[in-house]
Amino acid sequence: MSRLEELIVKFCPDGVEYWPLENLGEFYNGLTGKNKDDFGNGNAKFISYMNVYSNFSTKLDVSDTVKVGKNEQQNQVLYGDVLFTGSSETPEECAMSSVVTVDVAEPIYLNSFCFGLRLFDKSIYLPNFLKHLLRGEEVRKQLCKTANGVTRFNVSKPKMAKVTIPRPPLPVQEEIVRILDNFMGLISELEAELVARRKQYEQYRKELFAFGDNVEWKMLQDVCVIKHGSDYKSFGHGNYPVYGSGGIMTYVDRYAYDKPSVLLPRKGSLDKIHYVDQPFWNVDTVFYTEIDTSKTIPKFIYHYLLTVDLRRWSNVGGVPGLTQSRLNKIAIPHPSLPEQERIVAILDKFDALCNDETAGLAAGIAARKKQYEYYRDKLLTFKRKAG
């Protein structure tokens, strides 16, 4: 019998209680009454949408700031709080959770596109247990059903209040945290090694694009036409991928474009640039590009734009966003076609070494993540206590 099984037999042999969120805590809103200027001249830190979306444990060492007046009634984020994203382009990406698992040393706030849950009694859950539990399959299925919408989905707090989660005894929580944190530690080690390799790749890529005045520079609008995406909900299921800002969302029976294209984010994940060389559809949170391949290799544009910090071209605060007019003004080098081909061939090889999930470090990380998810969902499935 494992240590966890022994603890379950000792502390909850008849199962565990499941409680609705409304009985466990109180929801609170993120920042209110803020405009663009408040985010451009900040005096206090805030937790961004992407911070919540991307991290099981909330990152507090952030550079995002907002101006908050001395007497303003804004909700501060505290240790043990659970933060949720309030909207996304698909129900599956709504209500993503992030838990404050370390002490908060200074006032820090939550962006207006997210909301928080503060427990009435913080002694009944370990924050590190909640970070795993709320990302587990059983709870995520419930959270996804709280979203309403057509082209963009918003979380319903009344529905969120009815979501139920297990409440195992603390010794059981501690053992589950120990096991799952060990898995995450192994993943982190591999990710750190991959980060180091990617830094080498990025440095070499930077050197390849260090043209200076030796080549002609053009605006992005001079080498491609940026086009909007649109809704796909009325289409049937098919073989053509539908791209959102985070990548492939689903597959449909028609396509918007069938030539090589670089997909650029309009909202959401601004670091997600995609290269597509097969027919595809894209939603309105992503732009696609039409490129004259007799003058410019689409993959060359893709590799170069990976060196551009698109966040600098974004609106400030809230959900990150880009416009056609801003993207059109990005300067891009335009060497001869043979030189473009040479650079693309080199960078494709490096990209495969760093990102190919069928081999190397990326494959190891993908395998570890699947292993973690398997054990997480297995360990977090409890027998319900009768009554």
Which stretches of residues belong to each language-model region?
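Non-catalytic DNA-recognition/assembly elements of restriction-modification systems
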Residues: 8-31, 210-242, 364, 375
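Accessory (non-catalytic) regions of SAM-dependent nucleic-acid methyltransferases
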Residues: 1-11, 378, 387
